Design a protein with these regions (language model features):
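N-terminal auxiliary interaction/assembly segments of multi-subunit proteins
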Residues: 2-174
């Protein structure tokens, strides 16, 4: 199993043992950290580095493209993987091995599949009976993504050689 490396002067595992404002267990976050690194390293051959997680305070995103997967069963909520458009294009091209038009269904399918792989691998590692929904993809600057109310949304900032992205985890045990 992958163990987080030293990032920004600290260990991601140590940073997650005290999640932002201690409102979400690191046991719910670490599967998404591990899955993100595994999916990007294996599928796109791009290794992300992670910064300290933090709480998201509003529903607006600062990104242009988001892949969203809902959870049901013993875990409720969603995971969102968001990118700037240029970063998303480079990642999709690396994933499929050719240039993909961002206005095509192949582009949205690839973004949805990245979100699906991250959610699916994390679901397995959570060890709970959970279902994941079909991916939804939203494209547009400043889009808004609905969240479970009363449940913290933890943002995991990720940095790669092709640009930055974020994984947002908004889940709770049922």
């Amino acid at each position: 199993m992958w163990r987080p490396s030293i990032i920004n002067g600290g260990n991601v595992q140590e940073q997650l043992t005290k999640p932002p404002q201690a409102k979400m267990s690191s046991k719910l976050i670490m599967p998404f950290v591990n899955s993100t690194i595994n999916v990007f390293t294996t599928m796109a051959k791009i290794k992300p580095e992670l910064s300290a997680p933090h709480l998201k305070t509003d529903a607006h995103t600062t990104y242009d493209v988001s892949g969203i997967i809902g959870f049901s069963g013993e875990i409720l909520g969603s995971v969102v993987v968001s990118f700037q458009l240029e970063t998303a294009k480079k990642l999709v091209n690396a994933l499929v091995g050719m240039e993909v038009d961002p206005d095509s269904s192949d582009f949205t399918d690839a973004i949805g599949e990245l979100a699906n792989m991250i959610a699916g691998n994390a679901k397995k590692d959570l060890g709970l009976l959970a279902n994941i929904g079909l991916p939804a993809v939203v494209i547009g600057a400043g889009h808004v993504i609905g969240r479970l109310s009363g449940v913290p949304c933890v943002v995991i900032p990720c940095h790669t050689s092709v640009g930055d992205f974020a994984v947002e985890v908004n889940i709770k045990p049922a």
